[in-house]
Each structure stands twice: as structure tokens, then as C-alpha cells.
Amino acid sequence: MCLGDDCNNEKGTDRRTFLTGAAAAALVGLTALEYDAQTLPTRDQIVTRVLDDPNVQHGKVVFKHGGKETIDGYLARPKAAGVFPAVIVIAGNVITEEYIPNTCAALAAAGFVGLAPNIFHILPDNARTPEERRLANLAHTDADALQDIQAGIDYLRTQPFVKNGGVGVVGFCYGGKLAMMLGSRSREIDAVVPFHPGPTSAAEISRVKSPVQIHSGTADRHVPVASVREIEKTLKAQGAPTEVFLYEGADHGFLAYTRPYYKPDAAKLAWTRTVEFLRRHLK
């Protein structure tokens, strides 16, 4: 698996570039996570929250990165005894926004082990403003993030409740881009599910061999439909099994019930499709 700096020799957008252009402004807005409470969905409107499911065990974990530093993450698994396929969850900004732990828990409720590695561990504790967070992120490249994710995969391999075999990956925004990159570079990935993926080079996409299922909204202000169709075209041209689902009127982050863009019907349908896809390719 190519995870070093030499992986960025091709033309395209690495993490540093992605966070310095127009996408940076969008990402800064998304990482602020300070929404008017009146615009957020009410508990009655949230149809995808499963954090209180008594059949799911979940919480923070810490694992080694290259035998040196440690990385934290959020892990969820079924409470029942057994071994279960593993799925990596890649956040677009922070793993503490509740819908990310909830995604892990939803995977566990469906019979998987979900792990969200904290690829944003470089953020200093005192980074409180969007600009401080953006500047801290600039020091962390795509290659760094992929190494963090690989450390998470290695950690999962040591757990007695994780089934041997291929791993799935679900990513959001920048995490969707990283999900595509994993599908391109890792032989361990058997299913890739990007939600409104960030800019990914055509050369990177052209190497993806794993089955891919993409979810995005027709009203996404940061990932236009044309961009999604280009990804679809490139994947299908090389024979990668590909499914693309576009949700009418859905904006960026429509699965995130912690944001005003949450779209319950689209979120529920997208998650049903995601689980079916993962079951098909990981079991």
C-alpha cells in the first residue's frame, strides 16, 4: 500500500491544496459547527440516530501509530458475541460531531464494527476558531491522514471481534476523498462509500478497483452534480463496480443531523442503501 510522501507525485489536490482554495472557505464554514439552534432538526425529525441502541457498545479508543504516537478514535460494535466485518468511518472535519459516532453506532446496529480514526488529532486543544483549525490542518497532508487511517485498520486487525477479510470505508466530504484514495491504494478495502466526496484527481480515481457507492445531493453547494458524474464516468470506464445516488434537493451534509442541512428522507434512504451495499461486499 502506498502511504508515503511519494504518493503525492501525481497532479491533483492534496490535503494542503484542498484547504487553501475555494474549498477552504467552505470547510471552514463547516468546521465552525456553530449553527442557530432554530435551524437545527428537532429530535422528532431525526430518523437516523441510534446512539442509544442497547444492542450496541461504543466509545472512545486509543491505538498506536507506527509504535510511536497514539491516535484516538471512536469505535462501535454489536454487544452480542461474534466476529463482524470492519468499516472505517472518515469524518470531513472532526469526529466529535455527534453524527460521526452515530455513524459508527449505526454500522454496529447493522452487524459491523465501525471505527472513526481521529485524523484531525493534530488540531491543538486551544484551536477554537475556524481559522485556527484551518491553519493547524494545513500541516497534515493526505499522506498523513492515510497513515492515520491505516493505523486504525491495523488496530482493528488485532481485535478478537473483527472478522478477517476486506474492510469497508465510509467517508464524508474530505473523508469521502480519502475513502476514494483508500480504494485506489489499498488491497484491504473491499467496499467504498463516499458521501459528497471532496476533489479527487482523475488519476487517483482511475486506479480504484473496489466497488464504489456514491451519495450526493442535487443542491450540494460544495460538490456539484457534474463533479459526481465525472467520478462516475472515470470509475465505470475502468470497470470498477459503481453505483451513484443523487438526492433531490439535498445539500452538503444531508446525513448529518447535527446540521441544518439534514434531510431525513434522503438520510434514511442513503443509509439503507449503504448498509445493503456493505453487506453485499463484506459478508
Set out the residue ranges of the language-model regions.
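Short beta-strand/loop motif that positions the catalytic acidic residue
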Residues: I214-S216
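N-terminal twin-arginine translocation
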Residues: G12-T20, L27-V47
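Cap/lid segment of the alpha/beta-hydrolase catalytic domain
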Residues: F120-A143, G253-T258
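Alpha/beta-hydrolase active-site loop
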Residues: A136-T158
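N-terminal secretory signal peptides
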Residues: M1-T13
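N-terminal cap/lid segment of alpha/beta-hydrolase-fold proteins
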Residues: P41-K79
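Short beta-strand element of the alpha/beta-hydrolase
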Residues: F84-A91
